Amino acid sequence: TWIAYLVAGLGGLAAPLFVMIFGWGLVRSKSTTNGNIIKATILLLLQLLVNLFSPHLFEPLTPGILSLFALLILIKPLIVNMANNNISFLVFSISIFLIYGLSSFIYNIQGTSDWDSRVSTNNVTILVSHLFLTGTYPLFPWITFAVVGAFLGSSITEGGKTLPRNNTTLLLIIIGMSYCLVSLILANEEGSVWAHPTKGAYLNFFPANIGFMIGSMTGVLIFWLIIQELQISLFEYCGRLSLTIYVLHFIPLTLLSNIENERYWSVMEASLAVVIYTTAWLLFAFVWNRLQWLTIEALIRKLSSG
């Protein structure tokens, strides 16, 4: 239904936006090499904590978005170079499309859509593969959002804005929206699933196919423009506490999952639950913003600056 697509679509933008904001902060960070190593270590430990919070989703050592952040911190010099050098940025963009072409027509390097396979960590080889290619949030292709975020962070425009309102931005959004509209029409005519976490014919999250990358990048750019132009302080509060919220939100999410298993929710019930749950975290960020010292972000800053 359209409600399911709307709620799932907004939820699907959370991770891309999270990674893009991380890239934006990465290029603006003044941390030393030792500080970055400490941050990466803490993020890996937090990934373990998240996995333990959600045994119904992950194995203890399953790589996820926080282990992705750890890798991004460790390769920060490379990301900064691509963000500040137009030629490097262009080469990176072309490389991403070439790798997708290779994966689609020659050899599937992203693994299967089976969830159990993507979270399984039976041996070191699989663990490393999940970190870079076949996991839930592997370095490829999710590094793309970080590089774009870093690019925006290094190109401040008028009034301190990072995403310029120009013809290039408008053209990118139009191309992305056109792809989504055309693919939605084709999926409807074919009777196939347009977008799905693991079974999407055109937009697939696990693994993140090229359609998902186009659609989510378009959505994030639109969302970024809206927040930038309207200067919505509530979202700014969430941005400051994004890591704390991400780690903590798995605790009640696990409880909600147990409730859903006991009684199957309808699409309307599930959608309403998502809206209420999301709103609750917005309010949490507004209140907790006064207690910045009591956040995971503050803890990481303190440990990495010592």
Give residue spans per PLM region.
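Alpha-helical transmembrane segments and their immediate juxtamembrane cytosolic regions
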Residues: T1-G306
